[in-house]
Amino acid sequence: MSNDNDTLVTADVRNGIDGHALADRIGLDEAEIAWRLSFTGIDDDTMAALAAEQPLFEATADALVTDFYDHLESYERTQDLFANSTKTVEQLKETQAEYLLGLGRGEYDTEYAAQRARIGKIHDVLGLGPDVYLGAYTRYYTGLLDALADDVVADRGEEAAAAVDELVARFLPMLKLLTFDQQIAMDTYIDSYAQRLHDEIDSRQELANAVASDVEAPLSSLEATSQDVAERTDTMRAATDDQVDRMADVSREISSVSASVEEVASTADDVRRTSEDAEALAQQGEAAADDALATMTDIDEATDGVTAGVEQLRERAADVESVTGVIDDIAEQTNMLALNASIEAARAGEAGEGFAVVADEVKALAEESREQSTRVEELVEQMQAETEETVDQLDEVNQRIGEGVERVEEAMETLQEITDAVEDAASGMQEVSTATDEQAVSTEEVAEMVDDVDDRAGEIAAALDDIADATDQQVRTVEEVRETVGKLS
């Protein structure tokens, strides 16, 4: 078997080979390993014996590996194997030495099987087939037997050594021939597997030809049905195109409705702003009314002051009237005294003292009159001052009244502005109503178009029913094809 492998075994390739997964795939679980060990005759004693030979493996590993690779390099067919690996020969020798040392581990479980399976896969990737693999192992058989023979005959004499050498010489040819037979048997197995694979491929090809013949009629029916579906699809497409045109009209109407809605929204914004202005003006009117109310309150207070001043004038007038009465009494008494003085004067000659008394009385009355006159003068001055104060209060009243009038006028102007704003709001609402009417008309037109679209949708639905029936037929045909194809499995 020649080496036709062109795969380069790199570190990534080696790391990508999972020995455990490979062992699981070929069925090397614990039960299978136990059966193979038992069938081969490897029991606990055998394992113990192999473990006891570990010193021998360690002593001979390097020499055996060197002989192993020298043997491979001596044949042209196996020389190409080294070019398929990125490892050097020395690195390969180290790996092979580790393999030999593993023979004496004494435990041959799933871990051992996974490692050996991985090594076997790497050999396969390298292109090292069963013929080379089994043939090259005769170098290990020879080396290990020679090492065992040397170990056995040590210090046992020439006769024993000759007997062992004869045993080795007689057994090695048999072992080599058995290995050769194993190579041929392995090739036979491989050929058998390959032949069965070819037979299976031929069988599948024949079945595929039969399937192709069987599906020809259903496929023809499927083609005819598909053609019918295509025709109905054209019909549906025409209806769909018409529906698209109508939907374009609907879209335009919707655009018009959208424009109306935008106009309504814009008018609503204007109405909102007008309402806000009206509200602000109303607040100003309320503030103006409050100012007017405060002004009128001030007027009321000023009026109260005027009233109090007038009342004080009235009281002063009463006092003046009282003083005037006193003056009248004094005048009357003065007249009487004057009369008496005249009388007494006539008697002056006889009673001068009586005249003097009268004169004193007149003098006293004159002084009292003078005091009363002074008091009257003071009262008059006080009345004049209070009168001036009353006049000032009346001026303030007039001023407050003027301010009140101004506030009322401002309130009236504000109320007029509120009225105008309300009128603007009413006008805006009228515009909203008009736009809403236009929107209603557009909506009716859209509704009519939607009815037309609905009718076209009914036609499309009918066409879809026909397509559904054709599709069902296709499904049944596909089922027939599936049953026929199922024969391939």
From Swiss-Prot:
Tree of life domain: Archaea
GO process terms (BP): aerotaxis; chemotaxis; signal transduction
Any one GO molecular-function label of the UniProt entry: heme binding
Keyword Protein biosynthesis part of the UniProt annotation: no
Annotated ranges, domain Methyl-accepting transducer: 218-454
InterPro entries assigned: Chemotax_Me-accpt_rcpt, Globin-like_sf, Globin-sensor_dom, Globin/Proto, MCPsignal_dom, Protoglobin_sensor_dom
UniProt keyword annotations, A-Z: Heme, Iron, Metal-binding, Transducer
One GO term describing the cellular component: membrane
Record text on subunit structure and interactions: Homotetramer.
PANTHER family: LYSOZYME-LIKE PROTEIN-RELATED (PTHR32089:SF112), METHYL-ACCEPTING CHEMOTAXIS PROTEIN MCPB (PTHR32089)
Name of the protein in its database record: Heme-based aerotactic transducer HemAT
